[in-house]
Design a protein with these regions (language model features):
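Non-catalytic terminal/accessory segments
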Residues: 1-370
Length: 370
């Protein structure tokens, strides 16, 4: 049966892709079909995906725009594919990711197997102790502004399967159904919220930034998590030069450096007393700045360390307020812990990894709300 199809795609690959999508959960897309509704005719739905992808006739539906609030008060727009489309995207991702990921830089940490945000924070912490200056920058609307021609050039360099190339191009062109039900065509970018989008973002940034800076500034190590980047420098002059060079490089790649989220930082501590106006930066929910610490002999000194950011604390407190714990007094502590312990545990496991005493503020706030 498979031999009569245009493309040789195994049914087992589609099944494995579905299991990954199921594990990731997620909301319904434009067709309003939830994962549970999709599973009511699981065999038929998976066969339909396999049949259409194998014949070359699979056409991705529009992605559903969902706006979520950002910690800085802005709005982040996600593009949520349908469950069927998430399975189809996962099929391609599972096929191409192993070979592509092997090419990525060791200091690319976002959305990669075996990599994590905490690894990026820890590596940045260690480098801040060794190097005095940091260039921190963010890319304005990175997912929404990736140039399709440049991206597909990178994709074709790594992906040779014709059907994978065909569907990647179709996903890039899939329109967006906005919150007011307007269908907007897509001419650039890859929707943040798509299954394959993080891999495409990493591939684009691999050539736009990682390879470039490794060649032009090999003595300036970096940590990148998607479009959030920190680069370490030996001097203020080097940092100033590099910030300008990065801005130019991004423009060449048709991206824009975020004007208010890009800066030069001095990693001040007891051994680095230089007067410089900017002595802190926030990376992946942690604010790096001078903090009191004890050395091996128990003596107090100032070190440059990460701790949970005020923005992250504010976001967590806001979430706790929505639980309305004070009006749920009839609930037993066991019931409350069953409901909220998984969330709290995740927060403390992440933000408590570095300078954990800062998380006492959240623990105290939670106690007041009970």
């Amino acid at each position: 049966m498979a031999s009569t199809k245009s493309f040789d795609i195994s049914k087992q690959l589609v099944w494995n892709a579905y299991k990954r999508v199921k594990a990731n959960k997620g909301a319904a897309g434009v067709d309003r079909v939830s994962l549970s509704a999709f599973e009511q005719n699981l065999k038929g739905n998976l066969y339909k995906i396999w049949n259409r992808m194998s014949s070359g006739s699979y056409m991705p539906p529009a992605v559903q725009q969902v706006n979520i609030p950002k910690k800085d008060g802005g709005i982040r727009s996600l593009g949520v594919p349908t469950v069927s489309d998430r399975v189809a995207q996962m099929v391609v991702k599972m096929l191409i990711e192993p070979d592509i990921d092997r090419c990525f830089h060791t200091d690319s940490y976002g959305y990669r197997p075996g990599k994590s945000a905490l690894q990026a924070v820890d590596k940045t912490r260690q480098r801040c102790w060794r190097m005095d200056w940091v260039v921190e920058f963010d890319i304005k609307g990175a997912f929404d502004n990736i140039d399709h021609a440049l991206l597909m050039k990178a994709v074709r360099h790594h992906v040779k399967e014709p059907w994978a190339l065909l569907y990647i191009e179709r996903w890039l062109k899939a329109p967006t159904l906005t919150v007011d039900s307007t269908l907007v065509p897509r001419t650039q970018g890859t929707p943040q919220g798509g299954v394959i989008s993080p891999l495409l973002m990493n591939l684009f940034m691999h050539y736009a930034f990682d390879v470039w800076i490794s060649k032009t500034s090999p003595k300036c190590p970096f940590a990148r998590y998607a479009d959030d980047v920190v680069v370490h420098c030996h001097s203020e002059a080097q940092a100033n030069y590099l910030l300008r060079a990065i801005e130019v490089r991004l423009k060449v790649c048709k991206l824009t450096m975020h004007p208010t989220k890009s800066k030069i930082v001095y990693c001040k501590d007891s051994n680095r007393p230089l007067a410089y106006p900017i002595k802190a930066f926030t990376f992946l929910g942690f604010t790096f700045r001078p903090r009191k610490a004890n050395n091996k002999e128990g003596k107090l000194f100032t070190s440059f360390l990460p701790a949970v950011s005020n923005e992250a604390l504010k976001s967590m407190r806001s979430r706790i307020r929505t639980w309305r714990l004070s009006v749920r007094t009839p609930s037993t502590l066991v019931e409350l812990s069953r409901l909220y312990n998984p969330i709290l545990r995740g927060w403390f496991q992440y933000y408590g990894c570095f300078y954990p005493t800062q998380m006492r503020k959240l623990a105290d706030y939670l106690e007041l709300r009970l």
